[in-house]
Design a protein with these regions (language model features):
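Hydrophobic/aromatic residues positioned on beta-strands within the core alpha/beta folds
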Residues: 85-86, 110
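Two-component/phosphorelay signaling modules centered on CheY-like receiver
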Residues: 15-34
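Conserved acidic carboxylate
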Residues: 12
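Short amphipathic alpha-helix used as the core "switch/output" element in two-component signaling
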Residues: 67-79, 96-99
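Active-site residues of response regulator receiver
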Residues: 57-59, 86
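Non-catalytic signal-transmission and effector/linker regions of two-component phosphorelay proteins
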Residues: 1-7, 115-131
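His-Asp phosphorelay/catalytic-motif detector in bacterial-type signaling
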Residues: 5, 50-52, 76-83
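Acidic, metal-coordinating helix/loop segments flanking the phosphotransfer/catalytic sites
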Residues: 22, 35-53, 61
């Protein structure tokens, strides 16, 4: 399976959610090379290690949000696949910020992920942005 070779980083401020999603993805054979709650450490890791896909929460606590991080990552790594994984049911709830997602980014509502295969498929789609 091609997705086993993908190098995936996760940025999620909730440690339980981060650990749960990471374990579920690893159980699907995916390679989570880095997970953090910190925007700063995510940027540093990405610049030094060039992951294939970034799975980002929108609300990362005080400071930059997931869209801010997505744009910083795309600026440094133009071909990185990006998934914004959020609790917001409607992108309009993010106001006009949703339009500032980098091209090719995927938007996925956490509550819609009733099976981990949904997120795996989105990761595979996001990875195609690299092509």
């Amino acid at each position: 399976m091609a997705n086993k070779k993908l190098r995936i980083m996760m940025v999620e401020d909730d440690s339980f959610t981060r650990a749960t999603v990471k374990k579920a993805l690893e159980n699907q054979g995916l390679n989570i090379v880095f997970d953090t709650e910190s925007v700063k450490s995510a940027i540093t890791f990405a610049r030094e290690n060039r992951p294939d896909v970034a799975v980002l929460d929108y609300n990362l606590g005080p400071g930059p949000n997931g869209i801010d991080l997505a744009n910083q990552l795309r600026k440094s790594l133009p071909d990185i696949g990006i998934i914004l994984l959020t609790a917001f049911l409607n992108p309009a709830e993010l106001d006009s910020k949703i339009s500032s997602l980098p091209p090719g980014s995927r938007y996925l509502v956490k509550h819609s992920v009733t099976k981990i295969e949904v997120l795996v498929k989105e990761i595979e789609i996001a990875a195609k942005y690299r092509s």
